[in-house]
Design a protein with these regions (language model features):
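Signature for HUH/AEP ssDNA processing cores
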Residues: 2-11, 15-18, 23-144, 153
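DNA replication initiation modules
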Residues: 99-116, 121, 150-198
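Histidine-centered active-site/metal-ligand motif
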Residues: 147
Length: 198
């Protein structure tokens, strides 16, 4: 029987990591996620405006990349001002969304199978409360990739807190849904509780 929800697929992914599954298994799980994406299409422009309306700071990234568009000053120029967001995305409607961390949200950045193995160990050993504190979870296009949005702590970025896991805080950023790259789309799964943080 095939998994029916993203929560089921998250559990299947965790099992696959524990069993050190092959790439084909991760590709199959990713294909199931793609088939379950039945939400209405949202433009990058409207998504950037929604983030800004929640008080989150955004800035445009070069289409299909995680590189800030030249002249925007990257996360240092990030804003929640709807006029600036409109100006940026009217001029570059295919621009991906950079979401500055450290202001309202921080992000645990889990990178691929190595990060997922660390996640399983991390949750079991140290951070059982992280799932309860999560404001949102994002599947990234890389197989096994995930972002977990948490309330901001005021801490800065920390690379390699565990193998395959980085912490994005003050001075950092992540690529936000529904941005895309050559491997696929960034997507929320599970509850999204980013409203009312400001």
């Amino acid at each position: 029987m095939q998994p029916l929800t993203l929560t089921d697929l998250d559990a299947e992914l965790t099992d696959a990591i524990a069993e050190d599954a092959d790439k084909a298994t991760f590709d199959r799980i990713g294909a199931h996620v793609d088939r379950l994406d039945v939400r209405p299409a949202v433009t990058l422009h409207s998504a950037a405006l929604w983030y800004a309306s929640q008080g989150l700071y955004v800035f445009p990234l070069t289409p299909r990349t995680k590189v800030p568009i030249k002249g925007t000053n990257g996360c240092l120029g990030a804003t929640d001002d709807p006029d600036m967001v409109n100006k940026w995305w009217t001029g570059q409607p295919a621009a991906n969304i950079g979401l500055a961390t450290g202001h309202l949200v921080d992000v645990v950045d889990i990178d691929g199978a190595e990060g997922q193995r660390s996640r399983v160990k991390m949750w079991a050993d140290n951070f059982e409360a992280i799932d309860n504190d999560a404001l949102a979870k994002v599947c990234t296009p890389r197989p096994g990739g995930m972002h977990i949005y948490l309330p901001a702590t005021g801490d800065g970025n920390k690379a390699g807190i565990f193998p395959g896991i980085d912490y994005r805080g003050r001075g950092g950023y992540v690529v936000a849904p529904p941005s895309v790259n050559d491997q696929g789309a960034y997507r929320f799964f599970g509850p999204v509780n980013l409203g009312g943080l400001a």
